[in-house]
Amino acid sequence: MGGNYSVAIDLGGTIIKIGLILDSEIVRFTTISSDSVKGLSHMLPKMEHAIDSLLSEEGISSTDLVSIGLAFPGMVNPVECRVISTNDKYDDACDIDLCHWADSRWGVPFVLENDARLAVIGEWLYGAAKGTGNVVMMTIGTGIGTGVILDSKPLV
């Protein structure tokens, strides 16, 4: 099929959601159980397998993949592509170079951001908050997070 596909990963405390995206649309989707107390390094091979399966199901190869984004449930430094702090989930994440992981495995750029911030950006760009300049979102799952859009800009 070919194209400019991206992978979106929502790293939850109990479930990891992985979507294959083309032109801002989810074309394939899967979930895997998270064993977050064992750490992120324990989950990376399972995430790799899930991503490769999505590519295979879509009939494309990794050369059609242009980026991977990961929503992390904790404090991150997106510029340095590093997890800064975790909340008793994925405790080893601060020691993992996720940009290197994505580059060495698929040869694509990797974007890391806080999960609540990405959730509010998604609603602001595509969902219920589309067209508004100020949005506050609280995410409640295994943990609690907040994301804010202020004067049409994500608050960081």
Question: Where are the language model's segments positioned?
Answer:
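A cytosolic small-molecule/anion-sensing beta-strand core signal
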Residues: 22, 66, 72, 150-151
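Conserved active-site "lid/cap" helical segment
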Residues: 43-62
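Glycine-rich phosphate-binding loop of actin/hexokinase-like ATP-binding domains
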Residues: 130-156
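Short glycine-rich, Thr/Ser-proximal phosphate-binding strand/loop in the N-terminal lobe
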Residues: 2-49, 83-85, 154
